[in-house]
């Protein structure tokens, strides 16, 4: 329950040199242009793609310097609206007391709303308990999931007519500080997390309803490695590293038990995207290898028996990359280079193709 103390030993706020950024921080607007979002200088900044393919920025958003920690979680709905969630120390509070803050960008390149507090699952001033994950349901309502002080999961959801519901305690204990939220093909939200003893999923069965916790599935999981994607069936597949260092897939709605796919390239989180190449659906997985360089592996979507091979290493990066399709369906990847600046690359042709030359935005 949320009133018990179970704070994780490691704080994943990020640092000025290595920001913590999660979710859809590479976004595509209704006009097809891309945006990149990162935490910087106590706030959040944005780079925006122009009509000619060039980039402008960085530009402060959400009211400029808002005293934020270097952590940013991003979600985007089908309406193109980008929801940003940061962590902010509580003014006058004790050290390590934080609240979650939210902003929305409605249109590519346009100003975002001022940061507004959505408090914390345990109250207005509670210590860091986990890094939020954001997803947007089928009718445009944002859901902000966060590990709470009892080690379970809480969520705060937007109302239809504006404003927010109170924090809902979804129960659980000893969950991963880095949960992964995703919206399925029915427009309902799901939350995937790991536990010391296995895997756990929270599922929304009706529009706007509180997600429900399912039974723990025993499995050897490495915390902090999970990613998830909606596939061509509309069902979600979660990916994670097991304790033998293998990338595994799990899709409850498809009846897919935890299935090893390939030896992991490194130890950190996975990023996953669904893409279509010549009419064939593929799942692309990205990870930092043991040397800190980004690598990719692809297989036909929802065919977990297919062979996977990691690509040749790309540039050295900080943290996992972001992946998405551009307006023409081509693959785009974004990452934070070793020096702290964002870099992007476009995919090449073919189902096994990976992003090509990387360039600074």
Per-region residue spans from a language model:
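A structural motif
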Residues: 1-361
